UniProtKB/Swiss-Prot annotation:
Disulfide bonds: none
Cofactor binding note of this UniProt entry: Binds 1 NAD(+) per subunit.
Protein name per its UniProtKB record: Urocanate hydratase
Annotated residues for binding of NAD(+): 52-53, 130, 176-178, 196, 201, 242-243, 263-267, 273-274, 322, 492
Xref: Pfam families: Urocanase, Urocanase_C, Urocanase_N
GO cellular component annotations of the record: cytoplasm
Stretch forming the signal peptide: none
Reactions performed catalytically: 4-imidazolone-5-propanoate = trans-urocanate + H2O
Reported cofactor(s): NAD(+)
Catalytic residue list: 410
Organism: Brucella anthropi (strain ATCC 49188 / DSM 6882 / CCUG 24695 / JCM 21032 / LMG 3331 / NBRC 15819 / NCTC 12168 / Alc 37)
Cited NCBIfam families: hutU, PRK05414.1
InterPro entries the record matches: Urocanase, Urocanase-like, Urocanase_C, Urocanase_central_sf, Urocanase_CS, Urocanase_N, Urocanase_Rossmann-like, Urocanase_sf
Amino acid sequence: MSNPRHNEREVRSPRGDELNAKSWLTEAPLRMLMNNLDPDVAERPHELVVYGGIGRAARTWDDFDKIVATLKTLNEDETLLVQSGKPVGVFRTHKDAPRVLIANSNLVPHWATWDHFNELDKKGLAMYGQMTAGSWIYIGAQGIVQGTYETFVEAGRQHYDGNLKGKWILTGGLGGMGGAQPLAAVMAGACCLAVECDETRADFRLRTRYVDEKTHSLDEALAKIDEWTKAGEAKSIALIGNAAEIYPELVKRGVRPDIVTDQTSAHDPVHGYLPIGWTVAEWRAKQESDPKGVAKAARASMKVQVQAMLDFWNAGIPTVDYGNNIRQMALEEGLENAFDFPGFVPAYIRPLFCRGVGPFRWAALSGDPEDIAKTDAKVKELLPDNKHLHNWLDMAKERIEFQGLPARICWVGLGDRHRLGLAFNEMVRNGELKAPIVIGRDHLDSGSVASPNRETEAMKDGSDAVSDWPLLNALLNTASGATWVSLHHGGGVGMGFSQHSGMVICCDGTEDADQRIGRVLWNDPATGVMRHADAGYDIALDWAKQQGLRLPAILGN
């Protein structure tokens, strides 16, 4: 019997200004869905896998075809409903309603486990959407580069007087998310040693210039790091190996990185983490024949790696969990002090979230890189005093290879996002850009996620697990007129550990779009300021007052 999730076809998004659908509001999700499966973008496009273990864009290839066909015929007053990658209904709504509403991987809490999800997945009843895979706004590794860069820069400020020259970062994983780490480290001025078990992933990062060199030898990797740090160079190297074996070996040798983290796909014990002593081929085969055995071996290996990370932490080396839930896995394996070292959000990112600052991203539906160059210039024009952001845009232009449709990410917050969106829409209207722009974000944002082991770890008021906030965010984005809105479960940290929402809005140059953009790109980050103000963060309370937010039970207005 053929596998409904495997097809050798090659999918690429259309380019240019010719419509395949009835309007740009349906053309936009069509192109971004297809862009998610572009072989230059997705990790395993023939299996519909975009990134993050088994994060898919559609449940089956038949579902993909039906989504495409439906988007091509969808009217301006209709909304498509997508349930875990399957197009289940089209309903009449109105012109300002979202054209697509997506719910992926959501399970009733008591049943929200990998075992139960995998049973449903095997029966074809569910799909893991990760964050931006099933919500059709993944832009390749660039999507996480700036967030990782901001994290490393802040770590440098806190631990090394703001200077990472001559320092090096140890990490693991070069997949769709982890692949950003070597480039982000270099941009921040540091060297990076990234351990990756799957050589094809390392080769992909080499081709796209996200990593500088590759080796199979730990000794060679360490020699290179020593050479570069002594010379004050910022370069990166991928070491083909297993992080669960390499990290303890480094501890044993007394090697001292300057920062330690990890971004393997530990959130998914079956599909995301290679057990100690296994080959990649053996691992792939047993994912199908013995998934529970794989998970058991992977969890035991994660415990070994986390113990090594604790050893680094106890030796005084800054060590953080980069949001893959590896500490939780180790804790469940009996490592009682697994959470002694912090997650990256409470350690470095939360002050940004308090101002609604997060991963604002956009893609040029024209396919023309010049459209991104023009929008980069517009960002600089509208935010003239944000020199840190200007520096990021300059580095991104020089170092980041576009994957699929040209795109850009830059971290901006409440008060700036709507200004940029309206400016982009005006550029489409007056012909400066060759086709419309879509604006979206990662689900990792200030008001759109509840994830007690990542984005909402160690909240000031103890509200880490309260998931009303992403639900309210999705509802408000729907009411505000986003072009498509998504509500997912389990992204980043795995089943049972997160709920999160996403939105995308199309700048098609119309005056109607001005109204939608103004609402969505104000309200979306405002929910993040609201959420953090409610938790008692002074930065968020001050920013809410400064921006004139009406928060009755929080500000008394």
